[in-house]
Every structure is written in C-alpha cells, then in structure tokens.
C-alpha cells in the first residue's frame, strides 16, 4: 500500500467536495505537509489557483476574493506557524461574513506533543473564531469515502458566514508516484465524480419573516442608518429611504451615495441631534459603522423601535437598543417591506448638510490628506472600484467625501486592523478584474509590504495611493499623552516607498500637487498594471483639518 497515493485520493475527495459548494478560488502557500491538498487542488480543473509565500497575506488575499465573488474561497497551508498566520483573516471573515475554507495540513496524532519538528496543537487553535471547525482523522481506507464527503458537505451546509477550519493530518511519505492504492475506495462514490451536486444536500433557510406591523411604522418619523452592504443594495436603500421621506445616514461602505454627506461633521451639531430625537423608529441596514459622531449618536438615540437588518447572525448593535434583530439579505428585506411615499420630515438637517459641505469645499485646493479624502470621488476609475484602508484614511473619506451611489467600495471594517490591507485589495481586484483604486496609510503599507508581490499579477489598472503622514496620525485625534505620543503611539518611520515599488518592479510616482497627481492617475488608468502613488503630506494636517471642520460645523 502506498501512503502517499492514498493521501492524495483522500485529499482529492475533499477538494472535489468543495467544488459542489461554489468554491472556485483556491489560495495556496508553499509547504511539504500540505502536498496532498496542493496536488489535489492543482489537478482539479474547476479551480482558479492563487499562490503567495506569506500565509498571513494569503489569508487576506482569500478574504478579498470572497468579498467580491460572494462565494467561499479555499486556503491551503502547511503545518505549524503557517496555520497561525491565518488568524487575522479568519477573525475578519467572522465579523464581516465572507466564507473562507481553511485547509490546514497537520502532522498525524503520534507526532504531536512529542518534540517532532513543525508540529503544534492545531486542532481547535482558533478557539471560537471559526464559524465551523472540522478535525479530520488520518487518511485510512477503514473510513468510507462517503463518510468523508458527507462530513465536508454537512460542514459547508452549516456555514452561513465566516470561516470553516478543516484540519487535515497526513502521515509520511508525502511524495511518490500514483498507483492503484485507494482507487476502489474512491470509486465507491460512483457517478458523484461526474455529477455537480453535493453528495449530501441540506437546505438552510435565511430569510426574515415579514414584520406585520411595518405598514404602521412606515407612516412614522424614521431614520435610516446604512452600514456595509453591496452596491446594488446601496442603491435600493437610497431609493427606499427617499420614498419614505426619512433621512438616510450613509456610511462610507454603504454605497448609497450618502445623500446627506459629511454626517460625521453635522452630527456634532446639537441642532441635528435635537431634530433626530423626533424619530420614532430607526432602521439600520448593514453593520460596521465608521464615523465617531454617528456611533455616538447611535449609542444615545432612544427611538421607540430600533431595527437592525443584516444577513450576519448575532448581535450587531453595540448600544443594545430595545428593538428587533432581523437576519435577512437586505435586498430581500426591502422587497418584503416596501416604502410608502411620504414627505421628508427633517428640515434642519438638510440645511446643516449644505453648510457643512460648503466648509469642506472651501478647503479642497490645499494639497493634503483631508483634501484628498474629499476629492477621492474625482479620482475613481470609470466602471471600477474603491478599496479603503483603516485608521485615519477611512474616517476622513467617511466625513468629508460623497461617493457615488452604487459604486463598489470595499474595506476590512470588521476588526478594523491595518494588517493585510494590500493583500485584501489584491484579492478584490483579482475576483472582479476591474480597475481598482486602493488608498492606505504609510504604516498600513509597511505592515503588508510583501503584498506588493501580489500586485505584479493584476489583470486591470490598479492604483495604490499611500498617504504618507509619517506614522499613525489617527492618534492625533485621540487624547494620547502629548509627551509620549510620538514615541509610543505615532511611531514615525521616516521612510518612502520608491525602493519598495522598485523591488517589485511596480511603477511609482510621488506627486507634489493636484496637477501631478491627476497626471499620474491618468497614465495609470491607461495600463493594466499596478502603480504606487505616494502622497507625502504634513504629519498632522489631516487630523487638524478634521478637528477644525468639526468645530466650525458644531457652531453653525
């Protein structure tokens, strides 16, 4: 009997089972223990293969692929700390709902806790963060193939959102020519190999019941809060709120067109808050809100009813309002709960919005970080997409810009870490094949610098704008101790990214004014390649501009 041959047949069943659940993208890191899984994926024509040498980046690449494709994405890594490097992407997927299938190769049980090389306790190592976990036994013909395939099917059928961790121990030898070992075992699955359906099919209902009193609540004074959602959902939500005559407070990731832009500015005005207190119901569609003032208002508002609608299960309201948590796809929920044409009830807020927008526009000519955030709409590629980093940049865009309705916007706003942002953006581009504008800060770029290797393989124009404000300037907005701020919070690195771009053979520009930036962008959008554009800005100007605007608008 050939151990290596049966390992591969066992792995082939696993990978083929994944294809029956919509898995098309497989992300693979180099490794020896994962050889059976890697070869099974490589030999399956149903897969699109992606490779990367860094498992942390690989996990985020898969996350980006899943964001766009809306299908589960598989990740294959070897044993040991390679597995641990998937943790950040796994956590993010658990909070934002992307489906990741983590296939982690492992040593067999007899090599765990005995000093064997590259052998750690992998089973259960991700604690409660995966939505589902599956620890497979060592491959053996004593276990029928139908058990293996139905076990995979069951786990995937139960996976509504987040990650499925499948730990796969393999004994040596891992290499060798294929022979007939296990062929009969494999063939007992019969014509399943030629079919396209799962061996075990399970139906899972995901739809919220129609709220029978909706006809009553839609006649009241309401507020719509729009969080993270798809581009199509964003357009539908905007139309729905407009028909109802309810003010729509749209997050940067809502893709609603933010009909009341600069919400993070005007929500700091007491007149706006007073008017919003008249709302009898708040309907929040989508989670992961960005703006600080929006979150502060959301935490203190006390409507008669607060509804949260999202297809992710669990509590998504950190303020714990009394109301309803409705698990449903946003578009489906809107169809069940049509709007009734009514006149807008807010009078003061539209006036404040116009005045706040005027204050922002008055600053747009200065070459700086806050002004870039305001202008970002002008730089979006036609028929393309935007990926927004975390920390200060996403807050500035949320507060100072107005993105087009239905324009695809992606970000990692679950755990909101700065790790893996470039890798995620690379995955977003690969899955969509669209022109992509990504914007991150300098520390975020440094954190994921080796992901520039992934940008060598883009299929359409890709522009990475690195806003270099020399450190974590988000902490300039927080009451961090002045005497310790630079060393222990900002951590300026005093670096530029020209050599990093050159190392990966990427085009690079460092514009010093808006005309040079627009010229660099015009050239970048004409070529299906990646371009790094570094904007070197004064360290604290972005944070100071936001604070000044907040002060101005609060006194309108």
Curated annotation (Swiss-Prot):
GO terms for biological process: menaquinone biosynthetic process. SUPFAM superfamilies: Thiamin diphosphate-binding fold (THDP-binding) (SSF52518). Its cofactor is Mg(2+); Mn(2+); thiamine diphosphate. It catalyses: isochorismate + 2-oxoglutarate + H(+) = 5-enolpyruvoyl-6-hydroxy-2-succinyl-cyclohex-3-ene-1-carboxylate + CO2. Pfam families: TPP_enzyme_C, TPP_enzyme_M_2, TPP_enzyme_N. Binds 1 thiamine pyrophosphate per subunit. NCBIfam families: menD. This is 2-succinyl-5-enolpyruvyl-6-hydroxy-3-cyclohexene-1-carboxylate synthase. It comes from Salmonella paratyphi C (strain RKS4594). The lineage of its organism: Bacteria, Pseudomonadati, Pseudomonadota, Gammaproteobacteria, Enterobacterales.
């Amino acid at each position: 009997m050939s151990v290596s041959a049966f390992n591969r047949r066992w792995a082939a069943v696993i990978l083929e089972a994944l294809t029956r659940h919509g898995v098309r993208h497989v992300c693979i890191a180099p490794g020896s223990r994962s050889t059976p899984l890697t070869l099974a994926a490589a030999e399956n024509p149903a897969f699109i293969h992606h490779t990367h040498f860094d498992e942390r980046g690989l996990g985020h690449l898969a996350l980006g692929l899943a964001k766009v494709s809306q299908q589960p994405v598989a990740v294959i890594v070897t044993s040991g700390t390679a597995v641990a490097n998937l943790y950040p992407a796994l956590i993010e997927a658990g909070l934002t709902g992307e489906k990741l299938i983590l296939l982690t190769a492992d040593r067999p049980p007899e090599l765990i806790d005995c000093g064997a090389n590259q052998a750690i306790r992998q089973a259960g190592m991700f604690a409660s963060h995966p939505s589902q976990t599956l620890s497979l036994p060592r491959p053996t013909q004593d276990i029928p193939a139908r058990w293996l395939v139905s076990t995979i099917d069951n786990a995937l059928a139960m996976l509504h959102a987040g990650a499925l961790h499948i730990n796969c121990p393999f004994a040596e030898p891992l290499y060798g020519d294929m022979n007939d070992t296990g062929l009969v075992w494999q063939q007992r699955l019969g014509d399943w190999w030629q079919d396209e359906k799962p061996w075990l099919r399970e139906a899972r209902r995901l739809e919220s019941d129609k709220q029978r009193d909706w006809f009553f609540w839609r006649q009241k004074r309401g507020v719509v809060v729009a969080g993270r959602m798809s581009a199509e959902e964003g357009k539908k939500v905007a139309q729905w709120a407009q028909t109802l005559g309810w003010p729509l407070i749209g997050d940067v990731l809502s893709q609603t067109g933010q009909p009341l832009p600069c919400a993070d500015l005007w929500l700091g005005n007491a007149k706006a808050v007073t008017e919003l207190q008249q709302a009898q119901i708040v309907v929040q569609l989508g989670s992961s809100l960005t703006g600080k003032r929006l979150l502060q208002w959301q935490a203190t508002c006390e409507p008669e009813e607060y509804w949260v609608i999202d297809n992710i299960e669990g509590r998504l309201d950190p303020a714990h309002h009394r109301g309803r948590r409705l698990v449903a796809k946003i578009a489906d929920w809107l169809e069940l709960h049509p709007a009734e044409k009514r006149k807008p009830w807010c009078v003061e807020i539209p006036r404040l919005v116009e005045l706040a927008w005027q204050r922002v526009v008055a600053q747009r000519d200065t070459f700086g970080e806050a002004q870039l955030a305001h202008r970002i709409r002008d730089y979006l590629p036609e028929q393309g997409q935007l990926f927004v980093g975390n920390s200060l940049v996403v807050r500035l865009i949320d507060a100072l810009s107005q993105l087009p309705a239905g324009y695809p916007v992606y970000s990692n706003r679950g755990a909101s870490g700065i790790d893996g942002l470039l890798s995620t953006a690379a995955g977003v581009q690969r899955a969509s094949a669209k022109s992509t504008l990504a914007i991150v800060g300098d520390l975020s770029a440094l954190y994921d610098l080796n992901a520039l290797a992934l940008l060598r393989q883009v299929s359409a124009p890709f522009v990475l704008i690195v806003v270099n404000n020399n450190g974590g300037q988000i902490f300039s907005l927080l009451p961090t101790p002045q005497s310790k701020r630079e060393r222990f919070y900002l951590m300026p690195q005093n670096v530029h990214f020209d050599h990093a771009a050159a190392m990966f053979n990427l085009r690079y520009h460092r514009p010093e004014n808006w005309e040079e930036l627009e010229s660099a962008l015009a050239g970048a959008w004409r070529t299906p390649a990646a371009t790094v554009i570094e904007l070197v800005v004064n360290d604290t100007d972005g944070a100071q501009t936001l604070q000044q605007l907040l002060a101005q608008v609060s006194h309108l």
